[in-house]
A protein has these predicted regions:
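SAM-dependent methyltransferase catalytic region
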Residues: 69-251
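Non-catalytic nucleic-acid substrate-recognition regions in nucleic-acid-modifying enzymes
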Residues: 1-51
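Compositionally biased, intrinsically disordered low-complexity regions enriched in proline and serine
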Residues: 1, 5, 14, 55-58, ...
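Non-catalytic substrate-recognition/targeting regions of SAM-dependent transferases
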Residues: 20, 26, 64-67, 103
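General structural signal for alpha-helix termini and helix-helix connectors
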Residues: 29, 33, 37, 59, ...
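Core structural elements
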Residues: 45-63
């Protein structure tokens, strides 16, 4: 094809190094199927496969940037900093942050049993435990729609997509339907930032596709994920510094 698509996918039927050939030969078909389940009956299909593809897409500009052995320009930063987070690390982080916040305020052994990488709290000294109990009491007042999760370096949205699944379990635990929960998760719970425009677009797509797994009409509801590309900021206000704990007063 003699157009822009050739720059994106140089398709060949004979070249073994062709991207399409590598996709077909190198990635198991089940990894493209979001309905695939593992030996435990849990969802294992990879909506996140686009993250792997995007990392591959950035390989050439990344190699060029490193090969010149010069200072990395701000335009090159997205390519050289792309690193896909393995699935088990994503699960560990989400289950022991978002998941922990919920079950510490709303104890549920059945819910915890769904999280392979969840770790129970270690034994603490009495004074520490008393403070933790106060925090758990605050968690007990939380409703699912109150919780905010942000990935400030979201890449193609791998963490956000798994967080969506955990949020869905939390909502169902609280009595919500999957359809209503999917809408609320996009509107109230999940936020993401990245310096790469393309990564932000992929995250937007990945989150919507995950939502569609639970609400097949989500694309017609006019709901947009809270994911954004932010390359640089021109300033920060005193109020913003206060919000992020810089220790400033009003005077």
């Amino acid at each position: 094809t003699e157009d822009y698509t050739e720059m994106l996918l140089n398709i060949s039927f004979t070249n073994e190094d062709d991207v399409i050939r590598m996709l077909v030969d190198g990635i198991d078909e089940k990894d493209f199927n979001i309905t695939t389940v593992d030996e435990d009956g849990k969802a294992a299909g990879q909506v996140e496969i686009i993250g792997w593809l995007y990392q591959y897409y950035n390989t050439e500009p990344k190699n060029k940037a490193f090969a010149k052995k010069a200072k990395i320009t701000k335009e090159e930063i997205p390519a050289v900093t792309q690193l896909f987070t393995p699935d088990w690390i994503v699960r560990y982080m989400v289950e022991n942050s978002l998941g922990r916040m919920w079950v510490e305020g709303h104890p549920d052994d059945e819910l915890k049993s769904k999280w392979k990488y969840y770790l129970d709290e270690a034994e603490q000294e009495e004074s520490v435990q008393q403070e933790l109990d106060k925090i758990k009491a605050e968690y007990a007042t939380l409703k699912p729609e109150d919780i905010k999760l942000i990935d400030p370096c979201m890449g193609s949205g791998h963490i956000l997509v798994y967080a969506f699944d955990v949020f869905m379990q939390i909502y169902e635990n609280a009595g919500w339907s999957q359809r209503d929960a999917a809408q609320s998760i996009i509107q109230n719970n999940i936020y993401g930032l990245d310096i790469d425009d393309r990564a932000a677009q992929l995250s937007y797509f990945a989150v919507l596709m995950k939502a569609r797994q639970y609400d097949r009409r989500i694309l017609t509801r006019g709901i947009e994920p809270n994911v954004y590309a932010v390359q640089e900021g021109n300033g920060i206000s005193r109020g913003q510094l206060k919000y992020f704990g810089a220790g400033l007063t009003d005077t």
